Amino acid sequence: GADLITFHIEVHPDPVAHAKDLKNMGIKTGISLNPSTDVERVLPYLEHFDLLLVMSVNPGFGGQSFIESVIPKIESARMHIDKHNLSTLIEIDGGIDENRAQRVVDAGVDILVIGSSFFGAADREAFTKQVQSLKR
């Protein structure tokens, strides 16, 4: 079964209650933030979540271009997590290639979702090693 369930803050009226229900079932929780949503909307809830998923493309289909305006959102979330000594991880999904990977890691991302760039890489092994070597 699922060990972690992530849901979008934009569609859930009471994210904390939902997170508590999931945690009571032994499931880790994640909350997702769409590119157009203000990061301030999710910050007050991070203490209740194991993961913040920042969408860097609009949800729906692969191969979209990275939306640059998510970088300051990542930085704000990382500052909030560090300031409050939270264990919440930051994951990013959408438009991540070998050039953007280091930028988002520098901004505070812990987990990268990479699809099109990996599958389109001429040398997937080299691509994977490059991404694995990234350090904040």
Give a label for each model feature.
Residues 58-60, 95-99, 118-119:
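Short Gly/Pro-enriched loop/turn and capping motifs at secondary-structure junctions
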Residues 2-89:
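Conserved anion-binding
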Residues 37-49, 94-112:
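Catalytic cores of alpha/beta
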Residues 7, 114-115:
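Short beta-strand and adjacent tight-turn residues that come in two discontinuous sequence segments
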Residues 31, 113-114:
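Hydrophobic residues in well-ordered beta-strands that form the structural core
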Residues 1, 108, 115:
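Active-site-proximal glycine-rich helix-loop-beta segment
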Residues 105, 119-136:
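C-terminal helical cap(s) of enzyme catalytic domains, especially alpha/beta-barrels
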